[in-house]
A protein has these predicted regions:
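Conserved NTPase motor "head" modules and their coupling/switch loops across ABC/AAA+ ATPases, GTPases
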Residues: 1-31, 172-186, 190-303, 310, ...
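Post-Walker A helix-loop "phosphate-sensing" segment adjacent to the P-loop in P-loop NTPases
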Residues: 44-56, 287-295
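Nucleotide-state sensing region of NTPase/ATPase domains
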Residues: 48-126, 130-132, 141-144, 148, ...
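Structural recognition of the conserved hydrophobic beta-strand(s) that form the central parallel beta-sheet
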Residues: 72, 330-337
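A conserved P-loop NTPase coupling/switch region
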Residues: 103-115, 119-182, 186, 364-365
Length: 370
């Protein structure tokens, strides 16, 4: 899938933006806080029906405005045009349309335009709680497996209902608990099986990217832990019910799964330097891209936001070689350092566009300006 053109009104600090893109490489440079990340976030919104940074849609409306609109004009692999529209008004329901037809369920859109974003916020994958790492698995698997996404939605709905019963000050019949626990167990088993299969297939891809970027300097790994492994999830939920009532929430289940991120045999959270952490995250996301490309029927979009920060020159060079090659489709990349972008452009050749971003205004640079 190629994003040919985007139209943005009142999204974050972007008042009015109309841009035509290169099918290969699109570079955005400017100082921090000018709107580079917001432009990438608008592209992300068109794939995931939400912002990468702020899940509260109304807070993404430009200050002193009442709405935002994002429209993306795409071309599928077979040349078919696709138009995606998102509109949000304060105190109103978000509208999301494909070719002027509104989706009845936003989840039906997920995976239609596969996308991978690498950004400074990825540091939370290492530094943050286990929910960040579960979200990483969810974002990847949901883009190619509708059964997974449906099971995850069912599980989370049942979890909310069970937690409500656990907090109840009135006695609750066991049968009522069982209704939601059986739904959690059934959906949770699906989620567990698919997460386990994904991680097993993903690990060697991730390791190969890390070794390439680091030039074989360190070994990395991933291990997946779940209450569903080697036990009945339903029995675990029933057994934990007494403790859960005391706590007021569910202590067992696939919502507590963990993805351990290792440097050698130790947690990278404890052992990794800034450069190693950044290399780990970039390799993780590039492996995500490669996995989705192998699994799906269309090449994902790749968004690289300030990717070179905290990396030494040799690792920057390895990443430049990777993204300048033919393995990636359409790329959107931001940087405050024009030299980083120029080095990539030199390797890519002629199929690129360069944009200057300043105070929410984004302008394509002419050849003579470059």
């Amino acid at each position: 899938m190629i994003l040919k053109r985007i139209s943005i009104l009142n999204y974050k600090n972007l008042e009015q933006v109309e841009l035509n893109f290169s099918a290969k490489l699109n570079c955005f440079f400017g100082q921090n806080g000018m709107g580079k990340t917001n432009l990438l976030d608008a592209v992300y919104f068109l794939s995931f029906c939400k912002s990468a940074g702020n899940p509260i849609d109304s807070q993404n409306i430009r200050h002193e405005q009442d709405f935002f609109v994002i429209q993306g004009f795409y071309e599928a692999m077979d040349g078919t045009p696709e138009e995606i529209y998102c509109g949000m008004k304060r105190r109103s329901k978000k509208q999301f349309k494909r070719n002027k037809k509104e989706y009845s369920r936003l989840s039906d859109h997920i995976g239609f335009i596969p996308l991978v974003m690498v950004s400074p916020a990825d540091s939370e994958l290492i530094a943050g709680g286990s929910d960040e790492r579960r979200r990483f698995m969810d974002v990847v698997i949901s883009q190619y497996d509708k059964e997974y996404l449906d099971a995850l939605i069912r599980y989370n709905k049942a979890l909310v209902q069970r937690n409500t019963l656990l907090k109840s000050e009135q006695p609750v019949e066991e049968e009522l608990f069982l209704v939601w626990e059986e739904m959690m167990a059934q959906a949770g088993e699906v989620v567990f099986r698919k997460r386990e299969a994904f991680i097993s297939e993903f690990i060697p891809i991730f390791q190969s990217f890390y070794l390439y970027i680091s030039q074989d300097k360190e070994q990395v790994g991933l291990t997946y832990e779940s209450h569903a492994r080697g036990a009945s999830l339903l029995e675990a939920l029933k057994e934990s019910r007494g403790r859960d009532k005391i706590m007021g929430y569910s202590l067992r289940g696939i919502h507590k799964d963990e993805l351990n991120m290792l440097l050698g045999d130790f947690p990278i959270k404890r052992e990794g330097s800034q450069g190693q952490n950044k290399t780990y995250l970039v390799a993780l996301k590039l492996a995500q891209f490669d996995f989705l490309k192998r699994t799906g029927s269309t090449v994902p979009l790749l968004l690289l936001d300030d990717i070179f920060d905290k990396l030494d020159a040799s690792r920057v060079e390895q990443i430049v070689k990777l993204v300048a090659g033919d393995n990636f489709g359409q790329i959107f990349i931001t940087d405050t350092n024009r030299e980083h972008l120029d080095r990539i452009l030199y390797k890519v050749g002629s199929d690129y566009k360069m944009f200057r971003v300043e105070n929410g205004a984004i302008n394509e640079m002419e050849e003579k300006d470059q």
